[in-house]
From Swiss-Prot:
Fe cation binds at N33. One of its GO terms (biological process) is heme catabolic process. It is an enzyme of class 1 (oxidoreductase). This is Heme-degrading monooxygenase HmoB. One of its GO terms (cellular component) is cytoplasm. The keyword Cell division does not apply. The gene is hmoB. Keywords: Cytoplasm, Heme, Iron, Metal-binding, Monooxygenase, Oxidoreductase. Disruption phenotype: Neither hmoB single mutant nor the hmoA hmoB double mutant display robust and reproducible phenotypes relative to the wild-type. The lineage of its organism: Bacteria, Bacillati, Bacillota, Bacilli, Bacillales. Pfam families: ABM.
């Protein structure tokens, strides 16, 4: 399974969605731009996408109210360690109220992995961040047992968020 992501204005991206009604494409709006997320086993309909292979997934990409993309740049040497960490993750987020889906995305044309989580609402995501399962999932962060203390990261990670577009 592949995920393709492209960015632009909501009006322009909406025309792409309308041209391809049978494709599984999400249109979402962020603070600075809009995003299309296309999940498919085939080729993408985008002209210039960021391409990813799905290496872990739970739930369906449908019509969430809120999306969180954790962008994590990983060195070539660090990829096996990073992927192993996510393949052995606690899996707690799936049981949270308002959770809809997660995709761990391996980049095909860059060094930046994306951890995509989809939620019913922004408040559901914020509630998860205050929960025990969030603390459990991140308990090894900044410890010798975690991977944050190694040099597998190319640069600091960053998070982008998006809201559903009707």
């Amino acid at each position: 399974m592949k995920v393709y992501i492209t960015y632009g204005t909501a009006d322009f991206l909406k025309t792409i969605v309308q041209k391809h009604p049978s494709e599984n494409i999400l249109l979402m709006q962020g603070q600075e731009n809009a995003i299309l997320i296309h999940e498919t086993n085939g080729d993408t309909v985008f002209q210039a996408p960021h391409a990813y292979e799905v290496i872990d997934q739970v739930g369906e990409i449908k019509h969430p109210g809120f999306a969180v993309l954790n962008n994590i740049a990983v060195t070539q040497e660090g990829r096996p360690l990073f992927e192993n960490r996510f393949k052995n993750r606690a899996g707690k987020v799936e049981n949270e109220p308002g959770f809809e889906a997660i995709r761990v995305l391996r980049p095909l044309d860059s060094d930046t992995y994306v951890i995509l989580t989809l939620w019913e609402t922004e408040s559901a995501f914020q509630d998860w961040q205050q929960s025990g399962s969030y603390k459990e999932a991140h308990k090894k962060r900044d410890t010798s047992a975690g991977i944050d203390t190694t040099s597998i990261f190319s640069r600091p990670s960053y998070v982008t968020t998006y809201f559903a577009v009707e």
